A protein has these predicted regions:
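A structural signal for short, well-ordered beta-strand segments
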Residues: 55, 136-138, 175-177
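Cleavable N-terminal export/targeting peptides
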Residues: 1-47
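Alpha-helix initiation/capping motif
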Residues: 42-44, 70-74, 86, 110, ...
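Long, hydrophobic/aromatic N-terminal blocks
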Residues: 36-80
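Predominantly the C-terminal beta-signal and adjacent terminal strand-loop region
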Residues: 47, 62-72, 107, 155-211
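Gram-negative (and chloroplast) outer-membrane scaffold detector with strong preference
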Residues: 50, 59-61, 79-155, 163-169, ...
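Intrinsically disordered, low-complexity segments enriched in Ser/Pro/Gly/Ala and basic residues
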Residues: 18-20, 26, 81, 134, ...
């Protein structure tokens, strides 16, 4: 009986030792997982940079004039693309510049080109491993239709959704509104009554590289 008790006590101690070892190993694994997760989630600081390549579909919406009357754009669906560079000023806020372009066809098959060059500011919301950037771009837009060309102001608010593949690369999509007021003073060849406010949008896929 005494031998049995001794064996039972030794077995109990052995089980406690094994259980403690397993628990410690599990805790170490959990700590490593938490560490990996914490280090994998992007945390940005002043000077961290990003480069974007975007491409997708350009969607004409409508024009309206100074009186508020709405007109069809008479444009087909088109294509658009852009290159963007940004630098972080804080963990959630970045600024930079964007150069883009689009094309679409008029009813008589003339091609409209627009080439916007903008300064851009972005605020980033993060939900690991996803990020949601909300941006505003302001700048100048060169519109070209055959021999006619005009430079106008442009504003482009946008929202995106990105998945972080790793610490350097992310892939996502953006929806962007184009507001292009084409205003004539009447002092030139075009009367002021021909001023129009263009409203368009695009939906693009994006590749993001951090460095």
């Amino acid at each position: 009986m005494k031998n049995f008790n001794k064996k039972f006590i030794l077995l109990f101690i052995l089980l406690l030792f094994i259980s403690g070892s397993l628990f410690a190993a599990k805790s170490d694994d959990d700590d490593e997982d938490d560490y990996d997760k914490d280090t994998y989630v992007e945390s940005y600081s002043l000077g961290d940079q990003m480069f974007f390549i975007n491409g997708g579909v350009f969607i004409p919406l409508f024009f309206f004039d100074r009186s508020g009357e709405v007109f069809d754009t008479n444009l087909t669906l088109g294509g658009t693309g852009s290159l963007c560079w940004q630098v972080f000023l804080s963990n959630h806020f970045s600024v930079g510049g964007e150069l883009g372009g689009m094309f679409a066809l008029s009813p008589n098959k003339r091609i409209l080109y627009m080439i916007p060059l903008m300064a851009k500011a972005t605020y980033w919301f993060r939900f690991y491993p996803f990020e949601i950037p909300i941006s505003i771009g302001l700048g100048g837009n060169l519109s070209i239709l055959e021999e006619a060309a005009h430079i106008d102001f442009i504003a482009k608010p946008s929202v995106g959704f990105y998945w972080n593949f790793n610490e350097e690369w992310a892939f996502g999509a953006n929806a962007t509104y184009w507001f292009v007021p084409q205003i004539y003073s009447g002092s030139g060849m075009v009367e002021s009554g021909h001023s129009m406010f263009g409203n368009f949008m695009d939906v693009t896929l994006s590749v993001l590289f951090r460095f």
